[in-house]
UniProtKB/Swiss-Prot annotation:
Cofactor note: Binds 2 divalent metal cations per subunit.
Biological-process GO terms, alphabetical: catabolic process; regulation of appetite; taurine metabolic process
One GO CC annotation: cytosol
Assigned keywords, A-Z: Cytoplasm, Hydrolase, Metal-binding
Residues noted as binding a divalent metal cation 2 in the record, renumbered to the chain: 169, 201, 230
Name by which UniProt lists this protein: N-acetyltaurine hydrolase
Function (record text): N-acetyltaurine hydrolase that catalyzes the hydrolysis of N-acetyltaurine into taurine and acetate. PTER also acts on other N-acetyl amino acids (Met, Ile, Leu, Val) and N-propionyltaurine, but at lower rates.
EC number: 3.1.-.-
Reaction(s) the record says it catalyses: N-acetyltaurine + H2O = taurine + acetate; N-propanoyltaurine + H2O = propanoate + taurine; N-acetyl-L-methionine + H2O = L-methionine + acetate; N-acetyl-L-isoleucine + H2O = L-isoleucine + acetate
Residues where a divalent metal cation 1 binds: 26, 28, 169, 298
GO molecular function per UniProt: N-acetyltaurine hydrolase activity; zinc ion binding
Sequence similarity: Belongs to the metallo-dependent hydrolases superfamily. Phosphotriesterase family.
Length: 349
């Protein structure tokens, strides 16, 4: 294991885990999501290409991936800075920034945002989904990919001395591609060397999370130090959810604030409401998984920032926590979900 044992690695350096406080485990502060642009519905092309206007905000909430400008969160650093200050004022302490190679990770900006706001920011190492892999990435062996990931954690990424504190979000599709499978194996190898946290973006199929776990386990990964993201858009059946929970990963509900009628990446998915997400958390708590739940918003488009009428990074603290308490989740359990579980996950072995 690395000499980071017992520490959390932020963009400003290692810190004691007790310093983190309330932590959002899956956010983006600066990124491009143009890799996943989806054409607008027929007849809506003019709206999709027009400048942001208040009259179009509802359309953007329903079609966030069909407007090129909306996918460029990296253009809104000043707005994100103000959001982080508001998040800290609301009681937030840390954010895990999940932008990896392929979607324009910007470590110097993350470092500056942390300095400016006092929010601990943990950056992600590794690679996103297959469509963002370069030919060089595809040609790399598992060993070489692992070496790159380890270096991003121990020495710094993207030509900087800014070190990542988590591997991920590691992107996978459904079915998992050959290139993604190599990255998963490399992730497991790197994790076994470093004793570090890992976070996964699973494909949009109920079987995807368990298949990822199987690949990681067979390659030597530590599932107890791994977060499975996006469960709120992936596993809907309670029985299937409990079967997956038994595998031992952290269970992340990370699309709070995102409510849409039609999910373009999988038309079979009915995106849940925030009330349904809270209901799922209460179910998992009742079933004994309060020590394995983490939450976030996964903000990755402009329209979800408060600047553009969105919910922002403080939504969970201001709006979801009171709802959790009203739905039978105790304050102690809320504290586990927001403070203790992220702290345990992020601490290097």
């Amino acid at each position: 294991m690395s000499n980071l044992s017992g520490k959390v690695q932020t963009v400003l350096g290692p810190v004691d885990p007790e310093q983190l406080g309330k932590t959002l485990t899956h956010e983006h502060l600066t990124m491009s999501f143009e890799c996943c642009y989806h054409p607008p519905p027929a007849g809506d092309e003019a709206v999709a290409e027009s400048p942001f206007q208040m009259q179009h905000m509802y359309w953007l909430r329903q079609n966030p991936y069909s407007c090129h400008e909306n996918l460029l969160l990296l253009q809104e650093t000043l707005a994100v800075r103000e959001e982080l200050l508001a998040y800290r004022k609301a009681g937030g302490g840390a954010v895990v920034e999940n932008t990896t190679t392929g979607i324009q990770r910007d470590l110097p900006t993350l470092r500056q945002l942390s300095k400016d706001t006092g929010v601990h920011i943990i950056a992600g190492a590794g690679y996103y989904v297959d469509c963002t892999h370069t030919e060089d990435t595809r040609r790399m062996s598992v060993e070489k990919l692992s070496d790159v990931i380890v270096s991003e954690v121990l020495h710094g990424a993207d030509g900087t001395d800014i070190r990542c504190g988590v591997i991920g979000e590691i992107g996978t599709c459904w079915p998992i591609t050959d290139s993604e499978r190599k990255v998963l194996k490399a992730t497991a190898h790197a994790q076994s060397q470093l004793g570090c946290p890992v976070i996964i973006h699973p494909g949009r199929n109920p079987a995807a999370p368990a298949e990822v776990v199987r690949i990681l386990q067979e390659a030597g990964g530590d599932i107890s130090k791994t977060v499975m993201s996006h469960l709120d858009r992936t596993i809907f059946d309670e029985g299937e959810l409990l079967e997956f929970a038994k595998l031992g990963s952290y269970l992340e509900y990370d699309l709070f604030g995102m409510e849409m009628l039609n999910y373009p990446y999988n038309s079979e998915v009915d995106m849940p409401s925030d009330s349904q997400r809270v209901k799922a958390l209460a179910f998992l708590v009742k079933e004994g998984y309060e020590d394995k739940i983490v939450v976030a918003h996964d903000i990755h488009t402009k329209n979800r920032l408060t600047k553009f009428g969105g919910h922002g990074y403080s939504h969970i603290l201001k709006n979801i926590v009171p709802k959790m308490l009203r739905r039978g989740i105790s304050q102690r359990q809320v504290d586990k979900i927001l403070v203790d579980n992220p702290k345990e996950w992020l601490t290097f072995k």
